[in-house]
């Protein structure tokens, strides 16, 4: 899940959105989004929310799930 957390943050920043802006567009609180993006997140992420985030960020869901962190 750590790569997913990084992927969401990466694509959010690439789109120029703050956490507040993305959270508002997706329909969750900024705190919820922050917990999703947190390293080693323990908060669950539904498929519906994953699809909503990927739609707003204009990326395919698999791109979030297959995201690779370069050393």
Question: Residue ranges of each PLM-predicted region?
Answer:
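A short, Lys/Arg-rich alpha-helix, primarily the initiator
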Residues: 1-14
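Conserved hydrophobic/aromatic packing and binding residues within compact polymer-binding modules
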Residues: 8, 22-23, 33-36, 64
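Alpha-helical residues within the helix-turn-helix
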Residues: 13, 24, 55
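Recognition helix of helix-turn-helix/homeodomain-like DNA-binding domains
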Residues: 28-43
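Short, basic-rich loop-to-helix N-cap that marks the start of a DNA-contacting helix
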Residues: 40-55
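Short C-terminal boundary/hinge segments that cap the last helix of small helical domains
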Residues: 58-71
């Amino acid at each position: 899940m750590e790569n997913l957390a990084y992927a969401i943050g990466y694509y959010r920043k690439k789109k120029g959105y703050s956490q507040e802006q993305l959270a508002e567009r997706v329909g969750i609180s900024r705190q919820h989004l922050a917990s999703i993006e947190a390293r080693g997140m323990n908060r669950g992420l539904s498929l519906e929310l994953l699809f909503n985030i990927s739609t707003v960020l204009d990326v395919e869901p698999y791109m979030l799930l297959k995201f690779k962190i370069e050393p």
